[in-house]
Amino acid sequence: MELLQQWTQQAKAALTQARQLCGDAHKFNEDAKTDLRNSIKQHQQLKELAKLTASQCTRLDSSTALIKQLLDLVQNYPTFNQLNVLHDRLESSLKRLRDCTLDPALGSEYTNLYAFVDDTALEDLKTRLRGVTDGVWNAFEKLAGLLEEDLCANYHKRLEAVSLDFLPPAYNDTAEELADLLLQVAQHYDQCSEALNIYDTLSDAEKKDLQEVLQSDSNHVPSVLTELRSGLDQTIHYFNAVQSYKSKVDSATSILEALAEELNKNQLTNQRHEAAHELMRAQTGLEIPQLAQELVQLERHYTHFAKAYTALLQEIHRRQTYENCVRSIVDEFVGRLEKEQQAEAKCRIDFFNQYGDYLPQTLWGAVTDPPLHFEIIEHQYTELPNVKVIPDKNDKKSKQREKSSTTASKR
């Protein structure tokens, strides 16, 4: 009986200690879970902030690059005269359009390719070219004063110094294990308490068996407490790892938010620079790069227009060759079909003449059907015009197509 009382007291003390250990572990684990959840969310938001900050740096880069590009273009093309080369190329393309007479077979109301050119747009382009030249150098001086080449490099350097590649600690999975250990101690205490209540009602053999079981459990309690302490140590280690992760996130947040705030303030300044740049571009001739690009695009467009017209005539000629070839094939095939149909019709007539009087009409009504035949119908959406092809001296295939077309026509 004294042993039972001793084991019960030991079990009660062990249960109190186990509850304390589990309570401490639970608190550390819950605090760690809360901090980890918040820090992970903060980490993700920080990555988005880093992307946004990088995007703002990129915008600054683009703005700086645009300013430098505009300055270079102004230096290379400071006056309207230096755009004359592009203008002359455009005029050469337009002259080719004037000299290119439209084939009458096309049925167009115009006489040459130049009739398709928008004269109003061309004159507007020339007027704009003349209008932007006078104030170029004043704009150049103002624009040069807005260029801050070291600004973006400084922001990039500070942004790259903020590392966000660290990972959160792995999840602590000792909670269920500690709960099981606490349950073992609680069950042992319950068994000891129950044994005290029923001990006097048991036989000597039952008392002996009960004492053996309780003694075995009592001997196991210290190892359970050791495991609980180990679990608490592991939870504290996990808590410290979470705090270290949280500290990294907080530190990176402090640095990056300060950088983003500063960048936003300077972005406003940069926006003012961009607004001033747009104003100068509209008023003092910074449209030169755009106008030069328009000249290049127009020259290319009208050059390709002339080439496309020549290619169109060759395409019509190619289609004529195709139609002649197909018609020749169809004519030959139709002749063969008619020959076969005539032979088949004769065979059916001969058969009917020989056996028709002896075959009842109700035996097979189709005995007098005509032979299988086909109808080939030509579908042409638009009749091809009879245009004159402008041969390409360097295009041997064009000459071969023209030769094959002539051969097919003779057929």
Swiss-Prot record:
Please state where this protein is localized. Answer: Cytoplasm; Preautophagosomal structure membrane
Gene inactivation effect: Impairs atg8-processing.
Q: Which GO terms describe its cellular component?
A: Atg1/ULK1 kinase complex; phagophore assembly site; phagophore assembly site membrane
Query: Origin, by domain of life?
Result: Eukaryota
Q: Which PANTHER family match?
A: AUTOPHAGY-RELATED PROTEIN 17 (PTHR28005:SF1)
Q: Which family does it belong to?
A: Belongs to the ATG17 family.
Full protein name: Autophagy-related protein 17
Specify the species: Schizosaccharomyces pombe (strain 972 / ATCC 24843) (Fission yeast)
